[in-house]
Amino acid sequence: MNAKEILWRLEQKKSQHREKVRFANSDMDITSSLFYEEISHLSFDAGRLGLNFKNKKFGVRTDIHLLGGYDYGIYKQDWHAGFQTGNKWSRKFSYSLPYKQCDHIGDARTNWELNRHFQFALLAKNFYATSDLKYYRELQALFDSWRRENPFLKGISWTSVMEVAIRAINWMYTLAFLSQSKNVDKDFKIRLSVGIRNMIGYVSQHYSRFSSANNHLLVEATAIGLAGLAFHCEKWKTLGISILTEELLKQNYTDGVNKELSLHYQMFGMEAYALMIHSMQTCNCNVPEIWLQMLEKMTEYVGCSSWRGNVAMEFGDDDEGKILDLQGGEINHLQYIMQLCSLVLKTPYQYIFQHPVNETVCWLFTDEEIGDMRRMEPLPISDACCFKEGGNTFLRDGQDRVLIGIDHAALGFGSIAAHGHADALSFQMMMDGKMLFADPGTYIYHCDLPFRNLFRKTEMHNTSVSYTHLRAHE
């Protein structure tokens, strides 16, 4: 940790202390009043997020997929649920709330999925598309329940800045759909706008930096940038774009492989850039050329690492993370990301548009744009793809039945290598989309630490192991 990072962390502690003095002894509703005076004049413009309000290809699911397969219907208003146990997260001040290795409660990552509020945007979309008040009433009930039970900086939903950022993004899309709908209570829209501005104001003061700056920072910057576009706030727009530009080559190798060396986290970051690019294009805002060049390389890498655009061969962690979901239920995340990036780049990749188009994509692009992708000749995938700098090679059998992936990469990004595994020279193999030799992945993040560590160890991967060497370093 260098001197600049130490100074930043000290400044963050000072800021947190000021917030504790202001908010710890009160239950401030995030939607009741603005906490930051400089954002009081901002107004929301629903047309600047790039939604296709003419879309007629939609479903009306109201459930979201929860990490671990938990039943959303049981938990949909259980905002403080521990999930892995019957216990609840405390509603104490978030800076004083420990959430890692709390095995007596559960894995915070599971709870965060519920509090990202994909269901808010989903219900608002359903109401806009059908005018059926049952979706509006359910959205109101969830919104009122959440704001009452989750005052600002109280409880598990406020323990991660990135989680606040994802929630703010989903509130923006929620407000966009409601702004185009009839019979919407004006106070509801005002509360959403106030809540979004408060959350973005908070994120803009606390976004990740230095050794903490990984995929979290990309999502936080995207939230700030999208809010800058949607609220006509030049300060937020400029900040978001500048962070995303600076981080692009810090967090990715020049051949398109993300330095976290986790395919899913690469796609998570790609979604952030793609959503931001799409909104910038909608607003006639100049997109840095390096963004498009790198996103093209990253999309090519993901295409090479998948079987017929349907099944991903994943090395490293996979927590099923996403930023926006207007379809609901359990989605094919690979198809969604590849379709989204193909349309942003105006370049179809092999197999991608042979699959059903994800509904989120239908709400972001017109039928004509999607049709153009279907008619264009897709980019082929080579039978041998080697990403020397990023450290992965993929081999195919010529008939696209067999896919082999070989990991000859570093172990992860930065000093903590948070989402990479000790998987040097490991390989995977699938045939007809079925895994024959698989990476173990990991199923847990913030609890049961011995198992978290076990599934990241070398001996859990398809590679050679020197047990004498391992024992010497344990």
Label the model's feature ranges.
Residues 1-70:
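Extreme N-terminal leader/anchor segments
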Residues 59-97:
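Low-complexity, Ser/Thr/Pro/Gly-enriched N-terminal "stalk/linker" regions
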Residues 70, 82-85, 100, 206, ...:
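Structured loops at beta-to-helix junctions and adjacent beta-edge loops in soluble globular domains
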Residues 101, 105-295, 306:
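Aromatic-lined, polymer-binding surfaces characteristic
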Residues 261-437:
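Carbohydrate-active enzyme catalytic cores, enriched for enzymes
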Residues 413-418, 443-458:
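Covalent nucleotidyltransferase core used to form phosphodiester bonds in nucleic acids
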Residues 468-474:
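Conserved small/polar residues in nucleotide/adenosyl-binding loops
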